[in-house]
Amino acid sequence: SYEVAKTLQDHRVDYLAVAVADEGSELRKAGITSSIIIMNPELTAFKTMFDYKLEPEVYSFNLLNELIKAAEKEGVTNFPIHIKLDTGMHRLGFAPQDMPELIERLKRQTSVIPRSVFSHLVGSDSDQFDAFTRHQIETFEKASEELQAAFPHKILRHICNTAGIQRYPGAQFEMVRLGLGLYGVDPYTNQMLHNVSTLKTTILQIRDVPQEDSVGYSRKGRLNRDSRIAAIPIGYADGLNRRLGNGTAYCMVNGKKAPYVGN
């Protein structure tokens, strides 16, 4: 949102990242001037990215070739892009063995220029994946060094997400990507960060429900005592996962904890 972007810009954050070009263009129209990475660049949105100086993630040769073609058509040169490497997530990204071909393709054109190279950690928030995380970091470091050696300008590197920032300080390189941590969510211990937002609602109705009766879908909320149940007008459509039900989470009502009942 604009409010989050404005706060980050005021604190001189180097880069913002959004999912699609439309989000980036809306921030530009609202006055955000910070550099913006587009993490899911649509093939139909290249013109928008050029016009609003929105820098796309590039994860495949097909996307790279289409972007270069669009840039040449618009007369765009040296447009910054962000190269994604697949070091183990196996969703999007160039494989490390693609690096020689990628470098060759980048060097025989002038439309785009690599501004950063990055990857995504699979399990940085879990001790059980530490060996794999270290393998990812080593793979990334080797491939990114190969890319950097081919170009005279500095190419930024980033692989750490919120948990990675906390647990792998030696892998912070030149940038990090703070996501959940921006909102005070600590995916590792839930102890280091403080929540920065509060979701407030109102109570629509209160009813007394007898012991052994149930509340909610599939009769999941079985009552082991006579209970007073409050209904509130928010749920999974507002981002509350159904798995938070049956006492897993709670609301604060007049300063007292009221656990969720049902799912």
Sequence positions of predicted segments:
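Active-site-proximal beta-alpha core segment in soluble small-molecule metabolic enzymes
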Residues: S1-H158
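Active-site anion/phosphate-binding pocket segments in diverse small-molecule metabolic enzymes
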Residues: A5-K6, D10, V20-S25, P41-T44, ...
